[in-house]
């Protein structure tokens, strides 16, 4: 993939996350200051490679799971140490530090993630899975009319046992669409951060949202939540 194709793919991912509608060549042409014909040729190649696709009802393009994975991998490589700054970081820290009991700290961190990301938030507390913001998830355009609701419910039912058995060891893990080990058909991305707590050396906090989301912002927030909880709880 050329550097321009990478930039176009990133722009499609970010634009689609913002507007929730397929991205057309005319908008990309304005962003990159080239002709629409040039953009159409580049998008055709990205589609041939499997990074974007054309919905049946639109002339625009949307990212595929493969496209999202390429984008997320690039984020991790180019911005490995990004931290959330400003108001969001302060909100997370305040909600955690002023909560009192460890369980309340974790719940507050999840609730704050829900408010900041507009996704479903979750965390393990011992052998329990705390979930908040289900209405956020089902309020997204991808799930209107009950689409994939059963698959999402199955994912949530099986998530805590899977986390306990698989015990992902990375500080931050991102499972996109079909990569989800317990909900491949749900059309969701699971972003989780591992942290140490009084309940377990492998506790997890994160979000579940549609594959269409602002990965940079959500990954930073989830990573920061895990760091904050470990700093406060694991002493």
Where are these predicted regions, by residue range?
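Short, leucine-enriched amphipathic alpha-helices that occur as contiguous helical runs
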Residues: 5-9
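N-terminal helix-turn-helix
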Residues: 11-18, 22-74
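Intrinsically disordered, acidic Ser/Thr/Pro-rich low-complexity regulatory segments
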Residues: 69, 76-235
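Short acidic-hydrophobic sequence patches enriched in Asp/Glu that either
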Residues: 4, 63, 221
């Amino acid at each position: 993939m050329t550097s321009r194709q990478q930039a176009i793919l990133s722009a499609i991912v970010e634009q689609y996350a913002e507007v929730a509608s397929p991205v057309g060549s005319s908008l990309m042409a304005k962003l990159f200051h080239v002709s629409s014909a040039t953009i159409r040729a580049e998008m055709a190649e990205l589609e041939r490679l499997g990074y974007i696709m054309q919905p049946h009802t639109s002339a625009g393009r949307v990212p595929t799971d493969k496209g999202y994975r390429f984008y997320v991998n690039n984020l991790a490589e180019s911005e490995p140490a990004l931290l959330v700054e400003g108001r969001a970081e302060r909100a997370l820290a305040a909600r955690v530090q002023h909560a009192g009991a460890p369980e309340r700290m974790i719940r507050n961190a999840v609730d704050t993630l829900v408010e900041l990301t507009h996704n479903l938030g979750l965390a393990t507390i011992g052998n329990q899975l705390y979930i908040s913001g289900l209405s956020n998830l089902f309020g997204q355009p991808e799930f209107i009319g009950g689409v994939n609701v059963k698959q999402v419910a199955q994912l949530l039912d099986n998530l805590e046992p899977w986390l306990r058995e698989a015990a992902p060891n990375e500080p931050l893990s991102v499972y996109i669409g079909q990569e989800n080990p317990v909900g491949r058909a749900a059309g969701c991305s699971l972003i989780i951060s591992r942290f140490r707590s009084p309940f377990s050396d492998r506790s997890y906090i994160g979000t579940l949202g549609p594959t269409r989301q602002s990965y940079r912002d959500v990954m930073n927030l989830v990573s920061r939540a895990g760091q904050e909880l470990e700093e406060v709880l694991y002493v």
